[in-house]
Amino acid sequence: MTLGNRIYKYRTEHGLSRESIAEKCSVSSQSVQKWESDNSKPSLENLIMLSKIFNITLDALAIGVDEGVREERKAFIHPDYSEERLWETYADFLMTEYNQSLEEGKDVEEYEKLFKAVSCLKNFEYKECLGDILFDIVTNAPMRENYEFYEPSDLAEIKKSRDPSAMNKKEPNQSLLQSKIAGAWYGRICGCFLGKSIEGIKTDELNRLLKETGNYPMHRYIKKSEIPEDMLCRARFNFDHDHYADLIDCVPSDDDTNYTVLYQELITKYGRDFKPRDVAAFWIEKQPKSAYYTAEETAYCNFIKGFTPPASAMYKNPFREWIGAQIRADYFGYINPGDPETAADMAYRDAVISHTKNGIYGEMYFAALIAIAAVENDMREAIEQALKFIPQKSRFVRSVRLITDDYDGGVDESKCFSKILSRWDEYTYGCHVLPNAEIVIASLLYGDGDYGKTICRAVQTGLDTDCNAATAGSVLGMMTGISAIGEEWTSPFGGKLETQIFGVGKVNIGDRIDITFEHINR
């Protein structure tokens, strides 16, 4: 298209006459006609005036850049926010970020209204841009004066701030170890499956379900065939799935059990001296993005963007103190029976890729507790000893102390669990590490060494049901051994476990127990 053709095209598209163009350019209408017939060319001043009249760039008029290219040059390229997975859009969780920053001691209260205002916007590119600004604000915010906790994420600082009387390595009784390792594996798997059927349910509907199915207080698996029809149709929780004891012959995959198998594979490949970067690379290599949630999915996406640990845990990650690292602790306890120091160190190297502060401590604590449970028969003492491996002035220690103080003070079981739910709103903190750790500790103490009672209490209380019962079952299974886990818990799935791990798929639990011993002796 010639320059004359373009002048004619834009003039007619704008509904302008030659006379009006001539008047604006201070030329005759005959001059405009000559421009359009390419018998003469407008001066530079006239080209500039024409581009203003047509509201286009000068190069679009003079060089011949078409409309599509002009729009592309002006536009920004953005993702389709409606297609992103829930946990991938930082701006969707700005109030989670605000609350998280506030709780970890940052002086951000003056920005509360701003966070709320941006949170109310619809998802589009400018909301994400505003989210980036808010992220910079909280990242660089100072700590509040007189904040009572000290919660480092650096391992050297963690070790400086823990109890110096932490226990040394103690050799386990080899004649009992086979039973203990099997108990830990099955304890975790059965507990996870018990809570998986109703993962995400709120306590009002959970209590109604248990009562209407004759399972209150909870004492057995949930069966699909027992759920009342009106609950299937009208409940807020979606019961329409097949993760029920009467519908399976193999434990379905779940992130809580995926990680246990995944980290066995990690140790096989990298050995006991693996590094955080090894874990990050292994995540990408061995599982799809859909296998990760909240902090883990954020970290996974950060790996792809080029962030390495520990930055991968910190960049636009409002879930950095959620439960995701805590549920990854178990295998490090399994392969270090009686050696909580090494178990906690391994847990740190894993946790730091996706979590900070109490998110890290949750994994370190339960790795240490499981290692201690291999050589300690007193649950109260084991809980106390494991606390010594994390910072003593942390919110995590405070949470555990709230439970142990109630237990030691004779507070009855019902009251203790009620206090947990009164402290933490289940809609806001359902997946946060602190309330769920409280539930696990209370379940272990008030469960009185009874496997069924312990995992059922962990589920019946609500919040992150599968995570809590899995962790409680793992700790108690290690302490009491496989003989303490009744057949009613193990029989529905025939020793088989499904995973989402590439190249692994369905596994035989017995084989995984055998590999654990290889790693203990590695």
Question: For each predicted feature, which ranges?
Answer:
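Short, charged recognition helix plus adjacent turn
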Residues: 63-72
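DNA major-groove recognition helix of helix-turn-helix/homeodomain DNA-binding modules
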Residues: 45-60
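An N-terminal structural lobe/cap that precedes and organizes the functional/catalytic core
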Residues: 163-190, 194-255
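Catalytic phosphate/nucleotide-handling subdomain of diverse soluble enzymes
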Residues: 190-196, 201-217, 355-371, 440-512
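Accessory "access/gating" subregions that flank catalytic or transport cores
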Residues: 160-174, 297-323, 329-343, 347-353, ...
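A short, Lys/Arg-rich alpha-helix, primarily the initiator
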Residues: 1-13
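Short alpha-helical DNA-recognition segment
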Residues: 15-34
